Structure formats: structure tokens, C-alpha cells
Amino acid sequence: MPALSVLDLSPICEGSDASQALKNSRALAQHCEKAGYHRYWVAEHHNMRGIASAATSVVISHIAGGTQSIRVGSGGIMLPNHSPLMVAEQFGTLE
């Protein structure tokens, strides 16, 4: 079986909030892990009311804290918006 992955933007459902979106993403990652998925990706998006994945390293930490074996990572970081050193330090801390 090929290694399957998921890309999750942590969508905020109508009438809900970012906190619930992140809980939903964690639950989805847990279901994907049980189903045998290999990787779970999140991506950075800003100024979008319907997406809760602005702080990618925080989202990764939240999801990884609720899973055991699925690999959790970033599908995209907007480097022009961040100091490369800060990105390296944040992701180094997650290892």
C-alpha cells in the first residue's frame, strides 16, 4: 500500500471558532493515524477567517501531542513573513 498523507488547513466551520477547528484537526489526525496514513501536513495561511492554521508550529505541536506514530509536518511556511532563525528554532524545538 502506498504511503498516504493528508494536507489539513484547519477549516473553521460556519458558526464555530478557531479553537474548535484545531480540535477537529487533531481528531482528524487521530482517525488518519488509525486508518494507516503515514503523514499529516498543515499549512500556514493568514488573514483568512475560515482557516485556523496561521501559527503552523503551534498547530503541529497540538496535533503531534494527540497522536502516536503519524508523522506531522508543515506543508508550507511563508518565509518572507518570518525570521529564518525563528522558524529553525521553532521547528527544532518540535523534534
Where are these regions (language model features)?
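A short, terminal or domain-edge coil/loop segment
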Residues: 59-61, 91-95
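Glycine-rich anion/phosphate-binding loops
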Residues: 20-24, 80-93
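N-terminal beta1-alpha1-beta2 module of alpha/beta enzyme domains
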Residues: 1-72
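The substrate-binding groove and active-site-proximal loops of carbohydrate-active enzymes
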Residues: 73-81
